[in-house]
From Swiss-Prot:
PANTHER family linked to this entry: LEUCINE--TRNA LIGASE, MITOCHONDRIAL, LEUCYL-TRNA SYNTHETASE
Ligase recorded as keyword: yes
Family: Belongs to the class-I aminoacyl-tRNA synthetase family.
Example of a GO biological process term: leucyl-tRNA aminoacylation
HAMAP family xrefs: Leu_tRNA_synth_B
PROSITE patterns for the chain: AA_TRNA_LIGASE_I
Residue window of motif 'KMSKS' region: 638-642
Catalytic reaction(s) noted: tRNA(Leu) + L-leucine + ATP = L-leucyl-tRNA(Leu) + AMP + diphosphate
Pfam families per UniProt: Anticodon_1 (PF08264), tRNA-synt_1 (PF00133), tRNA-synt_1_2 (PF13603), tRNA-synt_1g (PF09334)
Residues holding ATP: K641
Primary residence: cytoplasm
Protein name (database record): Leucine--tRNA ligase
Length: 880
């Protein structure tokens, strides 16, 4: 006997039965032959870490709700799933568990696939792939070789974090206080050859395309605009002289503030700049500083916050206007990988340059004065005391101490200097972008091999397409010191495809953002010989993409860029990969800890803590269950391993069932906001589902309901039916237009409360109840599909796929009210209410309002001046 045939709600039994039906009928497999409009709903693919966390549950439940709703509204819906399977965590786990990254990864995929299925997600599993499989990454290898031939992939030296003990490159997050996370060695900055993709060739298109993405959050588009960082300025040439006065290669600097060029008192260059290396040859002190600067991380964020340091190289730059010699300084805040690796320093009008000049006693010149000073501070200038107006080009100012340019404003100075530099071949107008080419090389093992062969005679040669894929060996001994493919001469050895001579393979692997930049397209074309075939143009672009806002810059930028590469390769015909983007909020939870004598904290999982609360539910204290002793309440934070405040979704599913977990994760907060995990709230959702189950069972126990006869309904029956159809209208809008799932659930709960108060056992009373219960089951189906699957059968229907049932539509006739309750105000203050017929004439409404006893009391001795009626809502009597 199934749970649906008894009065007891057994979520495990209900969910198992529904999932077996979906699997047996291949319910969610789709193709391109449907005559329904397509809808592609995609949540960012997961990393197979080994177990689902609550962030996964929230992300994929949002996608599943949208997918099921869209199918019920008549769409051909694709919701696929795969695994972003390469990457550093697998290497770290392999070291810890003394296994190969591949074995660890595939084991995790098997386990997590089972967890996803247990959540009841309506996924087309026939399209599943893991990005670490050769039949997936062969396509990105092929694309890369084509980009090489087009000049869009190239190799140059770039600075990386180098661990001299482990002999490996470290990601920025693996550098902790300047040391390698594993070896503890001081990290060095090292220049090594790396492969890049020319994303900068698409910078303007990536920027312009943001204006077309109406369905993306403004916050994401703003972050991308800032990351692309388009700026207009001048590239100016400074001639350079060596210590002995001989000419060296000139410096070229880009500036958006050529109006300040007369304030240049020194020029800053990166530690890796060729001129810095040249100057250090005969300057041991400078050489030592350059070596020191090569230690530590290379991220832009680190450079912004670290102490500004520098040294005079002894070289001199020739000011392009005055001819004055200004010192060339090496500075730790200038990046070789950004721009030209050199910047003109204007300490009078740039805060960073000002800090350096004041620290080292360098000259500071004022070349800008405000035309509209607002206070004494703005009337005076003091280079030793920075003020924001010194660098504000949006204020009305004029040039001073700038020779023939004195008196010009920003635009006037820009034009005059541009004309001068271009005429004298000392500079030119340039559009510059903050965006840099995408470095795709990683000196790691567990990644897609870069398909390049190195030949002493022919140089870097792309692997011929017929020799692809270059397969990464998976059965390796992995220690974390070096890469197994670097230390395997047999794997490296090959022949040059151009001359047939001895050659070696590239041992770097791709940045894992490569795999996640085009996976969405592969889902559309399983089994295709190329990355995407004609099926891609049926499904693409993605209609709804879902993922965290932390991906706004890197993944979502590369995602857009790669789509343009696919378009230019004539694989897709759209310009952007996704029409709409939903960025879900974090899942947060309370934290608990005990302090240690050394100041560290032992974080305790919420499951191991007993919490005391006041009458309003606020936490007043907490104790460790194991010993009954107090623990410190640390506040709510994002669920994480570091704070040990994660909640195991599997434990919640085992205790409450997947539908309850899904229901809570959609009810507790709007999708874009943070969701605070609260097991009391989960328990509340479980009670709600049990109430629904009991109501349906009780109703069904009385036998089949008669047909609904709208004309025969009494006032109470009409009221319940009106509530049902009001709920249908609201929930449909919440699902479809607003993605406001929490308010949709709240509306269904209100309808449930109305049903609980409806005690009409008559024929039409049961018919109205049947309609309401059927509506509730269908309305909740996108969120609680297992329970809905079972309850639909209890309500007298055969076992079927509810996603193929039409989503309920509100009956406009049911929404019409026979009588209305209107508020009666006297001079804008509420004094009573009246009941009027829906079609009552104005005169009748006015008479009833004037006769309302409490309102009449407040009008004693006053004269009615006018009566204002807001139809269906308010009657306001204005009296004096």
């Amino acid at each position: 006997m199934t749970s649906a045939e008894t009065n007891a709600y057994d979520p495990q039994q209900v969910e198992s039965a529904a999932q077996k039906y979906w699997d047996a009928t291949r319910a969610f497999e789709v193709d391109e032959t449907s005559d329904k409009p397509k809808y592609y709903c995609l949540s960012m693919l997961p990393y197979p870490s080994g177990a689902l966390h609550m962030g996964h549950v929230r992300n994929y439940t949002i996608g599943d709700v949208i997918s099921r709703y869209k199918r019920m509204t008549g769409h051909n819906v694709l919701q696929p799933m795969g695994w972003d399977a390469f990457g550093l965590p697998a290497e770290n786990a392999a070291i810890k568990n003394k296994t190969a990254p591949a074995a660890w990864t595939y084991k995790n995929i098997e386990h997590m696939r089972g967890q996803f299925k247990a959540m009841g997600y309506a996924v087309d599993w026939s399209r599943e792939f893991a990005t670490c499989r050769p039949d997936y990454y062969v396509h990105e290898q092929r694309m890369f070789t084509r980009l090489m031939r087009k000049g869009l992939a190239y190799r140059r030296n770039a600075v990386v974090n180098w661990d001299p003990v482990d002999q490996t490159v470290l990601a920025n997050e693996q550098v902790i206080d300047g040391r390698g996370w594993r070896s503890g060695a001081l990290v060095e900055k090292r220049e090594i050859p790396q492969w890049f993709l020319r994303i900068t060739d698409y910078a303007q298109e990536l920027l312009d395309g943001l204006d077309e993405l109406d369905g993306w959050p403004d916050s994401v588009k703003t972050m991308q605009r800032n990351w692309i960082g388009r700026s207009e300025g001048l590239e100016i040439q400074f001639d350079v002289r060596d210590v002995d006065g001989t000419a060296l290669d000139p410096l070229r600097v880009f500036t958006t503030r050529p109006d300040t060029v007369m304030g240049v008192t020194f020029v800053s260059i990166a530690a890796e700049h060729p001129l810095a290396l040249h100057a250090a040859k005969n300057n041991p002190e400078l050489a030592a500083l350059l070596s020191e600067m090569k230690q530590g991380g290379v991220s832009e964020a680190e450079l912004e916050t670290q102490e500004k340091r520098g040294m005079d190289t002894g070289l001199r730059a020739i000011h392009p206007v005055t001819g004055e010699k200004v010192p060339v300084w090496v500075a730790n805040f200038v990046l070789m990988g950004y721009g030209t690796g050199a910047v003109m320093a204007v300490p009078g009008h740039d805060q960073r340059d000002n800090e350096v000049a004041n620290k080292y006693g360098l000259p500071i010149k004022q070349v800008i004065a405000l035309k509209d000073p607002r206070n004494d501070d703005e009337r005076t200038w003091d280079g030793a005391r920075w003020q924001d107006w010194y660098s504000d080009k949006n204020r009305a100012f004029e040039l001073v101490n700038s020779a023939e340019f004195d008196g010009l404003d920003f635009q006037g100075a820009f034009e005059a200097l541009a004309e001068r530099f271009e005429r004298k071949a000392q500079g030119q107008r340039r559009v510059n972008y903050r965006l840099r080419d995408w470095g795709v090389s990683r000196q790691r093992y567990w990644g897609c091999p870069i398909p390049v062969i190195y030949c002493d005679k022919c140089g870097a040669v792309p692997v011929p397409e017929e020799q692809l894929p270059v397969v990464l060996p998976e059965d390796v001994a992995f220690s974390g010191t070096g890469s197994p493919i670097k230390t395997d001469p047999e794997w490296r050895k090959t022949t040059c495809p151009e001359c047939g001579g001895a050659a070696e393979r590239e041992t770097d692997t791709f940045d894992t953002f490569m795999e996640s930049s085009w996976y969405y397209a592969r889902y559309t074309s399983p089994g295709a010989r190329d990355a995407v075939d004609k099926r891609g143009n049926y499904w693409l672009p993605v209609d709804q993409y879902i993922g965290g806002i932390e991906h706004a810059i890197l993944h979502l930028m590369y995602f857009r860029f790669y789509h343009k590469l696919l378009r230019d390769a004539r694989m897709v015909d759209s310009n952007e990969p996704a029409r709409n983007l939903l960025c879900q909020g974090m899942v947060i939870a309370e934290t608990y800890y005990r302090p240690n004598p050394d100041g560290s904290k032992d974080w305790i999982n919420p499951a191991d803590v007993e919490v005391q609360r006041d009458e309003r539910g606020r936490i007043t204290g907490a104790t460790l269950i194991a010993d009954g002793q107090p623990v410190v309440v640390g506040g709510t934070e994002k669920m994480s391993k570091s704070k040990n405040n994660g909640v195991d979704p599997q434990a919640m599913v085992d205790k409450y069932g997947a539908d309850t977990v899904r229901l809570f994760s959609m009810f507790a907060a709007p999708p874009e906001q943070s969701l605070e995990w609260n097991e009391a709230g989960v328990d509340g959702m479980a009670r709600f589902l049990r109430r629904l189950w009991a109501q349906v069972q009780k109703h069904a126990a009385d036998g089949a309901a008669p047909a609904l006869d709208v004309a025969a309904l009494d006032a109470n029956q009409k009221a319940l039916r009106r509530k049902t159809h009001e709920t249908i209208g609201k929930v449909g809008d919440d699902y479809g237009r607003r993605h406001s799932f929490n308010t949709a659930i709240a509306a269904v709960m209100e309808l449930m409360n109305a049903l609980a108060k409806f005690e009409d056992g008559s024929e039409q009373g049961r018919a109205v109840r049947q309609e309401a219960l059927q509506a509730i089951v269908l309305l909740l189906n996108p969120i609680t599909p297992h329970a809905s699957h079972a309850l639909w059968q209890v309500l007298g229907h055969g076992e079927t796929l509810l996603e193929d049932q039409p989503f309920p539509q509100a009956d406009a006739g049911a929404l019409v009210r026979d009588a209305l309750t209107l508020a009666v105000q006297v001079n804008g203050k509420l004094r009573g209410t009246i009941e009027v017929a829906a079609d009552a004439a104005r005169e009748q409404v006015e008479a009833l309002a004037l006769a309302e006893p409490n309102a009449a009391k407040f009008m004693e001795g006053l004269t009615v001046r006018k009566i204002i009626i807001v139809p269906g809502k308010i009657v306001n009597i204005v009296a004096a």
